[in-house]
A protein has these predicted regions:
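Hydrophobic single-pass membrane-insertion segments
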Residues: 23-37
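N-terminal segment of the mature folded domain
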Residues: 12, 33-229
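Short helix-loop capping/hinge motifs at secondary-structure junctions, enriched
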Residues: 194-203, 229-230, 242-250, 322-323
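Periplasmic-binding protein-like
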Residues: 181-188, 259, 295-322
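Ligand-binding pocket segment of bilobal, Venus flytrap-like solute-binding proteins
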Residues: 242-306
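N-terminal Sec-pathway targeting helices
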Residues: 2-16
């Protein structure tokens, strides 16, 4: 009996040793032939999997890009060097002009750059001193903020329309109008051809009121530019308010109407330049833009239809007190 017990214990002990040896061998050799990177990835994946089991996900409500129409403070303005100088002066005595993208951008949007270059090459003098000009690309509203806060005041200012100059004058800031309009431009809404066809079929015609109502109803994805910075955006804001109440655009009816529209706007660009780049992705059914930018872009004219709205963009030119 004792011998049988000893035999059973011996066999059991041998079995345990064999199991331990086998398991130990597998454990010690599990990473043989694998690189350190592979081993680390496997270990990391295992850790992530353990944590992932403890995480629960919920679907958040989508928040649209509402714009707060608050006053701009001087400390919120970017350093002036963040705004590109598109034409450098060639003399010690020069005048700096704030201009907008559609005048000092690239290609056909850079006609003011071409004029400035020719001026700088002409060798003009004032009181016997050689003079030149510097052009800086600054959005209409941002330029007004620099001037009104006094953070940076240029010698000349050419926004896309005269709203900005009128606001500066209304605030008691000296501005002398050199030209009421350097060149005329038109604000408009671009709609994809499918969207244009769909809205025409539903509403009978395409106009600002139709587009605003369709956007407020969530019928298509519309983008617009920030009215604090963009002349086209400000034009759109004023024109939209007037579609609800032409006599009192700041009435409760108008404000509520615009808020309903804005709730269904998925994208607000800071400037027309940003809107133009965003349009290249094809993610928007409609957005606002000036005609000059639209007509000079074959990609836009091929995909979208232009519907004009609002006030004329005359591109005035002002000088400031320091000039």
């Amino acid at each position: 009996m004792k011998n049988s017990q000893k035999s059973i214990l011996a066999i059991g002990g041998i079995g345990i040793l064999v199991f331990v040896s086998a398991f130990g061998g597998i454990f010690l050799t599990r990473n043989l032939g694998k690189t350190a990177k592979t081993v680390n990835m496997e270990e990391a994946s295992a850790v992530i999997e353990r944590y992932a089991k403890k995480i629960g996900a919920t679907q958040a409500e989508v928040i649209k890009s509402a714009v707060e129409l608050a006053d701009t403070q001087v400390d919120e303005l970017p350093d002036i060097d963040k705004n590109e100088v598109t034409i450098q002066p060639v003399t010690k005595l020069y005048a700096e002009i704030f201009s907008t993208y559609e005048k000092c951008g690239k290609g056909k949007n850079g006609w003011m750059n071409e004029v400035a270059e020719k001026f700088n090459q002409a060798g003009y003098e004032v009181d016997g001193q050689p003079v030149s000009v510097m052009i800086r690309n600054v959005a209409s509203g941002l330029g007004m903020d620099y001037i009104s806060t006094g953070k940076y005041v240029p010698d000349g200012y050419s926004p896309s329309n005269d709203f900005w100059g009128k606001m500066l004058l209304a605030d008691g800031i000296f501005m002398e109008e050199i030209s009421s309009g350097l060149v005329n431009n038109t604000a408009g809404i671009l709609l994809s051809k499918d969207t244009q066809e769909k809205l025409t079929k539903r509403y009978g015609s395409i106009n600002l009121k139709t587009i605003v109502e369709a956007t407020a109803g969530g019928e298509f994805a519309m983008g617009y530019t920030n009215p604090n910075a963009s002349a086209t955006g400000l034009n759109f804001l004023i024109s939209t308010l007037q579609t609800y109440n032409a006599k009192e655009p700041l009435s409760e009816e108008s404000v509520e109407g615009f808020q309903a529209f804005q709730t269904n706007v998925p994208f607000v660009a800071y400037t027309t330049e940003q809107m133009s780049k965003a349009a290249e992705t094809g993610s928007l059914d409609g957005f606002i833009m000036e005609y000059q930018t639209y007509i000079n872009d074959p990609g836009l004219t091929r995909k979208y239809q232009f519907t004009p709205f609002g006030f004329l963009h005359t591109n005035p030119l002002y000088t400031t007190r320091d000039t």
